[in-house]
Amino acid sequence: MAQLENNSTLLVRENELKGLVSNWLIEMKLMHRPLGFDYQGVETLEVKAQNLTSVAIALYAYGFNYLRSQCAYDVSPGGDLASVYHLTKVDDNADQPQEVCIKVFVPRTKPIIPSVFWIWKTADFQERESYDMFGIYYEGHPHLKRILMPEHWIGWPLRKDYITPDFYELQDAY
């Protein structure tokens, strides 16, 4: 009896994490994991790197036509890196447009994620910044190179395990 109660409690908790987008992705048989809602009520989903392209295309077809932001962060020293996508459904009569947040976690030893540049052009500079600061390689990105740091810079400055060089070479800005 206790096992049945534990299973039903887990199902209730899992259903509390699912929103409209998660239910729609389940209907479309697209792999993801619901992570719940943030403090503003935005649904958050985890997607594996190998499933990102199919999920992103489906979300674009569903109406998420605007990539509001893409960012990255270092989960923990020596741990995974995360790439985060904030998508918005922009249409003519939306006072409160629907939003969704997609998180992709990759190991720091092989941080490769497919680029969404071909779906949302606004990913161009944002993916480049994530590459420059964290070393996440966005496979298929047409201009993936450093955007903030000099081309010859060694390392990824926003990683938690980054060791700051002893000196910096000052360069002219022109």
Swiss-Prot record:
- Gene Ontology CC terms, in alphabetical order: chloroplast thylakoid membrane
SUPFAM superfamilies linked: Nqo5-like
GO BP terms, alphabetized: photosynthesis, light reaction
Query: One Pfam family this chain carries?
Result: Complex1_30kDa
Gene Ontology molecular functions: NADH dehydrogenase (ubiquinone) activity; quinone binding
State which Enzyme Commission number(s) the record gives.
7.1.1.-
Compartment(s): Plastid, Chloroplast thylakoid membrane
Report membrane topology. Peripheral membrane protein
NADP in keyword set = yes
Question: Which NCBIfam families does the entry mention?
Answer: PRK12494.1
Q: Which family does it belong to?
A: Belongs to the complex I 30 kDa subunit family.
Q: What does this protein do?
A: NDH shuttles electrons from NAD(P)H:plastoquinone, via FMN and iron-sulfur (Fe-S) centers, to quinones in the photosynthetic chain and possibly in a chloroplast respiratory chain. The immediate electron acceptor for the enzyme in this species is believed to be plastoquinone. Couples the redox reaction to proton translocation, and thus conserves the redox energy in a proton gradient.
Subunit arrangement?
Answer: NDH is composed of at least 16 different subunits, 5 of which are encoded in the nucleus.
Alphabetized HAMAP family for the sequence: NDH1_NuoC
> What PANTHER family does the annotation carry?
NADH DEHYDROGENASE [UBIQUINONE] IRON-SULFUR PROTEIN 3, MITOCHONDRIAL (PTHR10884:SF14), NADH DEHYDROGENASE UBIQUINONE IRON-SULFUR PROTEIN 3 (PTHR10884)
This one is known as NAD(P)H-quinone oxidoreductase subunit J, chloroplastic
